[in-house]
């Protein structure tokens, strides 16, 4: 197994697909990396030489924020919004949808399981 950016990449998959296992690298970014380095996209990870794996590792380290650094950056951005007490920060703090979705009905994923309220008594 090749280890890139602290992630064990599956060896039996194509390079483009395997790179998407790294948090912060999607299909488009993986395609850019592979074409920039001149690696055939249909090649499997197990067929890559150590030098090619090293090139991929260096390209990712140089050009992209991935894994722990990216997670930390996103968490810090959310924390900054919460500290500013702006509208988006307050929504994050309350655990409600941030981007203007309705909450009268729906938003169950963000709000959590529905809390039962006393129904109409007969």
From Swiss-Prot:
Family matches, as InterPro entries: Rbsml_uS13_C, Ribosomal_uS13, Ribosomal_uS13-like_H2TH, Ribosomal_uS13_bac-type, Ribosomal_uS13_CS
Gene Ontology cellular component annotations, sorted alphabetically: cytosol; small ribosomal subunit
Gene Ontology biological process terms in this record: translation
Recorded GO MF terms: rRNA binding; structural constituent of ribosome; tRNA binding
Keywords of the record: Ribonucleoprotein, Ribosomal protein, RNA-binding, rRNA-binding, tRNA-binding
Keyword Cell inner membrane: no
Signal peptide bounds: none
Chain spans, region Disordered: 95-122
Superkingdom per UniProt: Bacteria
Family membership: Belongs to the universal ribosomal protein uS13 family.
Subunit structure: Part of the 30S ribosomal subunit. Forms a loose heterodimer with protein S19. Forms two bridges to the 50S subunit in the 70S ribosome.
Biological role: Located at the top of the head of the 30S subunit, it contacts several helices of the 16S rRNA. In the 70S ribosome it contacts the 23S rRNA (bridge B1a) and protein L5 of the 50S subunit (bridge B1b), connecting the 2 subunits; these bridges are implicated in subunit movement. Contacts the tRNAs in the A and P-sites.
HAMAP family associated with the record: Ribosomal_uS13
Name under which the protein is recorded: Small ribosomal subunit protein uS13
The gene coding this protein: rpsM
């Amino acid at each position: 197994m090749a280890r890139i950016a602290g992630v064990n990449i599956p060896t039996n998959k194509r390079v483009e697909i395997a790179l998407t296992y790294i948090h912060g690298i999607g299909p488009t970014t993986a395609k850019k990396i592979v074409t920039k380095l001149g690696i055939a996209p249909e090649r499997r990870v197990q067929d890559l030489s150590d030098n090619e794996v090293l090139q991929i590792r260096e390209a990712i380290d140089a050009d992209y924020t991935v894994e722990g650094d990216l997670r930390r950056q996103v968490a810090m951005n959310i924390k900054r919004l919460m500290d500013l007490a702006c509208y988006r920060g307050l929504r994050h703090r309350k655990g409600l949808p941030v981007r203007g979705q309705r909450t009268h009905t729906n938003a169950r994923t963000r709000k959590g399981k529905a809390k039962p309220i006393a129904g109409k008594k007969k």
